[in-house]
Amino acid sequence: MMYHIPGVLSPQDVARFREQLEQAEWVDGRVTTGAQGAQVKNNQQVDTRSTLYAALQNEVLNAVNQHALFFAAALPRTLSTPLFNRYQNNETYGFHVDGAVRSHPQNGWMRTDLSATLFLSDPQSYDGGELVVNDTFGQHRVKLPAGDLVLYPSSSLHCVTPVTRGVRVASFMWIQSMIRDDKKRAMLFELDNNIQSLKSRYGESEEILSLLNLYHNLLREWSEI
């Protein structure tokens, strides 16, 4: 399943990020991809050795960790270190699949269950640059407002279409979820959303408490910690 997570960064945060990224050191984006991806990847990424990168990636981690909808949808166990990319002048990233595992600075290795893109450019400021994701439900084309995030299974083939005008800047990362299975994770997310909706409409009740108990028992049964 694919999820749109709005408002991960405020407009003020986005403006500050963009101003700082204007001063960043950018390198060839192929430095962080494997052999298959390198054949179809043509973009730039912020140099991960810079002091600015360390500060910005930490802010992204703080923002997603504090976002309730992101947590409910992803049920994250481990987050990769966020990266930042830039597309301009017809740069693109052809169809590819993300690696199943990635190295992690604290955990050694992590499984990539979910991929996330946090948009940092106003969609009206550039042409092209759509994230295209192929999954079992068909093809999805995504171009979100700056500050919004899209979450989708890392097992999906995906690409970024050529940016023919302007500049597309984004942050991206991978998530190892406590729930490995996409279908089980989607069911828990739907159940959680319905519980929250019922609570806001009717207040606390025995029935809602029973549903909450069911949610946590399923999470206990399916989670890998």
From Swiss-Prot:
Biological process, per Gene Ontology: DNA damage response; intracellular iron ion homeostasis
UniProt keyword Glycoprotein, yes or no: no
Any GO MF annotation of the entry: 2-oxoglutarate-dependent dioxygenase activity
Domain called Fe2OG dioxygenase: residue spans: 78-177
A Pfam family that the UniProt record links to this protein: PKHD_C
Residues annotated as binding Fe cation: H96, D98, H158
Gene3D superfamilies given in the database record: q2cbj1_9rhob like domain, Rabenosyn, Rab binding domain
EC numbers, comma separated: 1.14.11.-
Recorded coiled-coil stretches: none
Keyword Oxidoreductase attached: yes
Keywords: Dioxygenase, Iron, Metal-binding, Oxidoreductase, Vitamin C
Co-factor requirement: Fe(2+); L-ascorbate
Chain sites annotated for binding 2-oxoglutarate: R168
InterPro entries (alphabetical): Oxoglu/Fe-dep_dioxygenase_dom, PKHD_C, PKHD_hydroxylase, Pro_4_hyd_alph, Pro_4_hyd_alph_FE2OG_OXY
Cofactor: how bound: Binds 1 Fe(2+) ion per subunit.
PANTHER family cross-referenced by the UniProt entry: PKHD-TYPE HYDROXYLASE YBIX
Designated name of the protein: PKHD-type hydroxylase YbiX
Natural source organism: Escherichia coli (strain K12)
